Swiss-Prot record:
One Pfam family it belongs to: NAD_Gly3P_dh_C
The organism's place on the tree of life at top rank: Bacteria
Protein name from the UniProt record: Glycerol-3-phosphate dehydrogenase [NAD(P)+]
Phylogenetic classification of the source organism: Bacteria, Pseudomonadati, Campylobacterota, Epsilonproteobacteria, Campylobacterales
Any one GO CC term of the record: cytosol
Amino acid sequence: MSKVSVFGGGAWGRALAFALAEKNEVRIISRRDISSLLEPLNQKLKTLNCTSIIQVSHKEALDAQYFVMAIATSALREWLAVADLPQKIKILCASKGIESGSGAFVSDIMEERIAHKSIAYLCGPSFASEVVHSLPCALVIHSRNLELSREFGTLMPHFIKTYASPDVVGGEVAGAYKNVIAIAGGICDGLAFGMNAKASLLARGLVEMSRFGEHFGAKMETFLGLSGAGDLFLTSNSTMSRNYRVGLGLAKGKAINEILKELGEVAEGVITAKAITEIGQRENIYTPIAREINLIINGKNVRESSKALMA
């Protein structure tokens, strides 16, 4: 049984801790006390004859064979600067997004501190609320070190099927960009535009994210698979998606600060829309949906903007 430490006590971090506890000894670290949130998960694990998830200190968490990163992209650089991670490390990053201001991808931030051969990235269609009920799903573990991808795959529970891919850029662009398209999907549904419009929006969104990714060397096949189309269709069609709910709120005319306060959680697509817009302008990449979502987030009338979204 391997020792796995999960950094991040949010919904996704807790879900991954639960999933990994089927085969491993799992500890979790969070800035807040999450013992009450771990209790129902540990009760389920007990019925499955699995070890409980334990919340530990940062120092205790460093005593592990594998590390899983599930913290917000906006906090990633700051966290890595003080994490004091061991030299020999195997880390699975489940963070999705693009850093605001710098426009850095998650891999750029990670690889400033950790060798790329030691990092893998988890992508694909997966709601935390379904993972904690052991519902089946399929994910992709991207890494320039495919042996590491497959090694992390062996840690996963029976209900998660994993595939290995060397296309790190494709995986992280898809994982970040789909959150922006999901906001657009929420707006489309919130304005009751119908399924014809929704299909058009998602198809164009897939093309847009693919174009953006290919500019940075990503492979088209990544966007047609689980990390791209799979995650996009899931996130853009369900109220289980925070970014989709942001879109619903914007469609009602709510201000972004009000929506985020109601959510009480991070919605990566809000920051990512701005980052993609800035990168698109700098690199001369056509990003019409991301650009329009960024304008709506910053106060443009949603009905007026919807014409441009569907153009």
